[in-house]
Curated annotation (Swiss-Prot):
Physiological role: Substrate-specific adapter of the anaphase promoting complex/cyclosome (APC/C) complex that confers substrate specificity by binding to substrates and targeting them to the APC/C complex for ubiquitination and degradation. Recognizes and binds the destruction box (D box) on protein substrates. Involved in the metaphase/anaphase transition of cell cycle. Is regulated by MAD2L1: in metaphase the MAD2L1-CDC20-APC/C ternary complex is inactive and in anaphase the CDC20-APC/C binary complex is active in degrading substrates.
Effect of S92A: Loss of BUB1-mediated phosphorylation and inhibition and partially defective spindle-assembly checkpoint
Domain of life from the UniProt record: Eukaryota
MF (Gene Ontology): anaphase-promoting complex binding; histone deacetylase binding; ubiquitin ligase activator activity; ubiquitin-like ligase-substrate adaptor activity
Lineage start: Eukaryota, Metazoa, Chordata, Craniata, Vertebrata
Disease linked to the protein: Oocyte/zygote/embryo maturation arrest 14: An autosomal recessive female infertility disorder characterized by oocyte maturation arrest, fertilization failure, and/or early embryonic arrest.
Effect of T157A: Loss of BUB1-mediated phosphorylation and inhibition and partially defective spindle-assembly checkpoint
Name the UniProt record assigns to this protein: Cell division cycle protein 20 homolog
Residues annotated with N6-acetyllysine modification: K66
Amino acid sequence: MAQFAFESDLHSLLQLDAPIPNAPPARWQRKAKEAAGPAPSPMRAANRSHSAGRTPGRTPGKSSSKVQTTPSKPGGDRYIPHRSAAQMEVASFLLSKENQPENSQTPTKKEHQKAWALNLNGFDVEEAKILRLSGKPQNAPEGYQNRLKVLYSQKATPGSSRKTCRYIPSLPDRILDAPEIRNDYYLNLVDWSSGNVLAVALDNSVYLWSASSGDILQLLQMEQPGEYISSVAWIKEGNYLAVGTSSAEVQLWDVQQQKRLRNMTSHSARVGSLSWNSYILSSGSRSGHIHHHDVRVAEHHVATLSGHSQEVCGLRWAPDGRHLASGGNDNLVNVWPSAPGEGGWVPLQTFTQHQGAVKAVAWCPWQSNVLATGGGTSDRHIRIWNVCSGACLSAVDAHSQVCSILWSPHYKELISGHGFAQNQLVIWKYPTMAKVAELKGHTSRVLSLTMSPDGATVASAAADETLRLWRCFELDPARRREREKASAAKSSLIHQGIR
C-alpha cells in the first residue's frame, strides 16, 4: 500500500499539465483581474472625489481615433529671427550710428565710402537690413565671394535664375586683310565708332570700314616719306576722328566731309595713345608727357601731365569722365583727376606692381572706380584695381604678353589680347577671373582690341596683318528683347521730358 502511494505521488510530480502553485499568473488571468477592478483604497477614493467636480473633456467612453500631429506652419504668436540671416556686425554698426551726430560730408567723400563698402562687403551698408523676415539666407551678389560661403550655399538657386554656359564661337565671324600694319607694341591702331565704323591705321594711311554696309574708304595718307600713323581715336558721338602721327602731330578729321579740321602740335615725339573726354582730347607721347587739348579753342593745349619717364602707351578716360588712367613703358600706372588740385596736376594713385610695360588699360563700365591693367612680356599679369582705395582687388598670371583689355557689360566679363606663344584672345569672368574661353587663330601677336558699339563683336588687329571679328558677346534673343524694351522706355521718357 505504501508502494502504491509513493508511485502515485511520483506520477503527479512528473505530470507537466498540472498547475504550478507558485508560478506568476498568466496573461489572461491578469486581464480578468484588472477588468474586475481592485478594491478601492482610501487614497484612490479621495482622488476620485476631488476630480468629480470637473467638466469632462470629451464624451465618456468615446475613444479618440484622431492622432495629433505637428502643425505644418508655426502658430505665429512671436517672431524669433534666425541668427544665420542676421548680419550682426552691420546691425551693431547701424544701431550705434543712430546715437552719433551726423558729420557733414561732401558728396565726393560719400560716394567714395559707398564704393569702398560695395567692393569690400559686396553690398551697400546704408541699405543693409538688420533682420530679415525669413529664415532663408539671402542670395549673394553676383560674383561675390567671402569666407562664409556656407550661408549662401544653404539656399538652392531657383531654376529660372540658374546660369547655363553660353555658346562662344571659337572661329572668327570675319577676317579682313590689314597689309602693312606696324608690328609695334606701343601703338594703338584700331578704334570702333558709335556709328559702327571701324578705323584702322595701316602704316602711313587710315582706312575706314563700315560694318553695316561693308564699304571701305581711305581717309588720309601721310605726305612725307617715312612718316606713319601711330594712334587713332573716335570721339564719343562718332563723327570726328583724332589721329596721332610719328611726327608728333595730333590731327582732327571730319569723317562725313573727309576733311582735316585742324592740326595740333605740342608734343616733341610721336603720339602713341589718344583718349576723348567730351571736348577734351588727351594725347600720350613717347616723351612721357600727356597733353590735354581743348578742341573748341584756338589755344588748344590747356594742360601737361608729367608722370612717366618713358613712352605713354596706354591712355583711357573713365566712362564718367572723372579719372584718366595712363600706362607707360616705365611699368607705371597713374590715375589722374579731371581737374588740377592744389598742388597742380598730380596723380591720385600710382601703381608700381607691374614688372613690364603697361599698354592694356580699361575702365569697368558698371563700376567707375574699378580699373583693369595688363603688363608686357616681363610681367604677363592682369591686375584689377580700386582707384579710390588704391587696393589691388585681384591679379592673374596670363602666361603671355598682355596687349589689350576690354570689358563686356552684357556678361560682366573681360577679354584680353596676348602675344607669344599662342597669340590668343582670352575671356575672363569678373570678379573671380576664371578663364571662360580662349579664341585662337592669329599666327602672330595681337596688337590691339576694340569693341563694336552694340558690345557683341570684338575686333583684333595682329602682327600677322589680319583683322579678325569675333562675335563672342552676342546677346541671346531674350536678353536682346529686354535691352530693346529698356532703351525704348528710356527714349520715351526723354521725349516726354523735352516736351
